[in-house]
């Protein structure tokens, strides 16, 4: 009679194990649609704007998930030494457009630049 009890334990825990494995595979197959964005900017926005030649020097600002793409009126007024002091990960220049590789806080930086007076 004891063997029947053990057989019941094995059967029920076996079914529970198979159900857990099935559910975990379903969860693992779901695509991650969330984009992680940070709201903390590791430098002062005013320092970034002044290093770029002031708010009036900005013509157009676009973002990718980790880059800020800025078109400037006067490229010569952009101070690369001041920008490098802000620990920007990368700066790419193409004619009057700069690509700043910053991180996942670029949308917050874009909002603060546009809101700045």
From Swiss-Prot:
GO biological process, one term: phosphoenolpyruvate-dependent sugar phosphotransferase system
Compartment(s) of residence: Membrane
InterPro entries, per the entry: Glu_permease_IIB (IPR036878), PTS_IIB_1 (IPR001996)
Transmembrane segments: 1-21
Domain PTS EIIB type-1: 42-117
EC number: 2.7.1.-
GO CC list: membrane
Family matches, as SUPFAM superfamilies: Glucose permease domain IIB (SSF55604)
Membrane topology: Single-pass membrane protein
GO MF term (any one): protein-N(PI)-phosphohistidine-sugar phosphotransferase activity
Keyword list, A-Z: Membrane, Phosphoprotein, Phosphotransferase system, Transferase, Transmembrane, Transmembrane helix
Physiological role: The phosphoenolpyruvate-dependent sugar phosphotransferase system (PTS), a major carbohydrate active -transport system, catalyzes the phosphorylation of incoming sugar substrates concomitant with their translocation across the cell membrane.
Comment text on domains: The EIIB domain is phosphorylated by phospho-EIIA on a cysteinyl or histidyl residue, depending on the transported sugar. Then, it transfers the phosphoryl group to the sugar substrate concomitantly with the sugar uptake processed by the EIIC domain.
The protein, known as: Putative phosphotransferase enzyme IIB component MG129
Organism: Mycoplasma genitalium (strain ATCC 33530 / DSM 19775 / NCTC 10195 / G37)
């Amino acid at each position: 009679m004891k063997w029947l009890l053990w057989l019941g334990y094995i059967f029920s825990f076996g079914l529970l194990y198979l159900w857990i494995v099935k559910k975990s595979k379903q969860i693992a197959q779901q695509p991650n649609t969330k984009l992680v964005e940070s709201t903390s900017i590791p430098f002062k926005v005013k320092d970034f704007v002044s290093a770029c030649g002031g708010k009036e020097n900005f013509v157009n600002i676009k973002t990718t998930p980790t880059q800020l793409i800025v078109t400037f009126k006067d490229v010569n007024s952009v101070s690369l030494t001041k920008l490098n002091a802000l620990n920007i990960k990368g700066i790419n220049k193409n004619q009057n457009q700069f690509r700043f590789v910053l991180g996942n806080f670029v949308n917050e930086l874009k909002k603060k630049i546009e809101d700045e007076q």
